[in-house]
């Protein structure tokens, strides 16, 4: 199965490169621009596409001012400028807000390990992770702070939040998929980032399976962490 996945990934990347090469000479249409935006995001966030960045730049160079000012044009520029936050780097001290409008900075939570949980209300695995995250928070309050950050728009975030009772920080950066989640290079949710008490990125992971987050946190936090899935 792993070998088939690798083959599929390789073929998808090759198709991307060939399409971008063709796009350099094709007329710029709305569909062309939408496709360029999708590929720009892939190049920014997935290692297998990184080599095609020069092709994205060449295609972007063909855009006139109205095209660059379109939503897709702005998206391409955003992803071309995006610098991915890697493990070992300091996490940016971004501003977030809660459902009641209270403003926070990530630095407000320093002093304990910080688990960032990127989620969406339409994501099944995100919802499935809630019971385990709740246990983790209850058992490890002394050493760990959990901060959930939505990838939804504010209206959807509030709607979904009304259906769940979070016992931890449930926040929004107001930027959806172009917010902090993009800067970590994630292209799906749930996605998790563990920060040191000083705010350094210790580890990143994407996806959820029962017990995986519990095991992962113990691996990095060590003896001060209490497992909740035996």
Model-derived features with residue positions:
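Generic structural signal for well-ordered beta-strand positions
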Residues: 104-105, 202
